[in-house]
A protein has these predicted regions:
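Flexible, glycine/charged-enriched surface loops at secondary-structure junctions
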Residues: 47-50, 67-74, 86-97, 179-189, ...
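A glycine-rich phosphate-binding loop feature that marks nucleotide/adenosyl-phosphate handling sites
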Residues: 57, 74-80, 96-106, 136-141, ...
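Conserved PLP-enzyme active-site core in the AAT-like
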Residues: 1-90, 152
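Generic non-transmembrane alpha-helical segments
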Residues: 81, 85-89, 118-126, 169-171, ...
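PLP-dependent enzyme catalytic core of the Aspartate aminotransferase-like
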Residues: 142-208
Length: 208
């Protein structure tokens, strides 16, 4: 659904799923546009960088292409596949699944003693990047948490599909089950690296 016709103000980032450079946009009705401009510039914004503006223009142009719609559909397919695969491994999805690029996972069903902080740290060692996240009625502090948040935009851009989501769920579960075994985590990290080697982020780059 498109919020623009219904909301007075719409904000979004130009990075993340839009795949542009770091930044953001504010869309508004004409009635409050000048107030927003005055609030943003020059107090909170200044020194525009032309190369970043150019990169945003490219991102917007790509978003207008039919291929971007296909990319968005593949993101949702991958997110749902990852959600199903994680559920098969014993994790609980807070919302029972997902309709977008994000998954919020309650770790307690998988391991009551496991915290989001610990999961984030050991998964990072194993080559799986995510972040700790609070869940509804979380008994732990926001710095510790009982959940983690996962996204699939990056791996989808790199060309991974639903089969790879099953592998990612498997890596995640195995790392967490063996989190006290450094050698086992390092061995799984090599498997993760082998998978990623088939999907380089910049396949046409000549830089090594």
């Amino acid at each position: 659904p498109n919020p623009v016709p219904h909301a007075d103000v719409v904000t979004f980032t130009t990075h993340k799923t839009l795949r542009g450079p770091r930044g953001g946009c504010i869309l508004s009705t004409e009635a409050i546009a000048k107030k927003i401009d005055s609030a943003v510039f020059p107090g909170n914004q200044g020194g525009p960088l032309e190369h970043v503006i150019a990169a945003k223009a490219i991102a917007f142009r790509e978003a207008m292409d039919a291929g971007f719609a296909d990319y968005a559909r593949r993101i949702v397919d991958n997110a749902r596949a990852l959600a199903d695969a994680l559920a098969d491994q014993g994790f609980r999805l807070v919302s029972g699944g997902t309709d977008n690029h994000l998954l919020l996972v309650d770790l307690r069903a998988f391991d009551e003693a496991l915290t989001g902080k610990e999961a984030q740290e050991v998964l990072d060692q194993g080559g799986v990047t995510l972040n700790r996240n609070t869940i509804p009625d979380d008994p732990r502090s926001p710095f510790v948490t009982s959940g983690v948040r996962m996204g699939v935009a990056s791996v989808t851009t790199q060309g991974m599909g639903t089969e790879e989501m099953t592998q990612i769920a498997d890596f995640t579960a195995r790392i967490l089950r063996q989190r006290d075994d450094v050698a086992a985590v390092n061995a799984i990290a090599k498997e993760v690296a082998e998978l990623c080697a088939h999907y380089p982020p910049y396949p046409d780059s000549t830089l090594k």
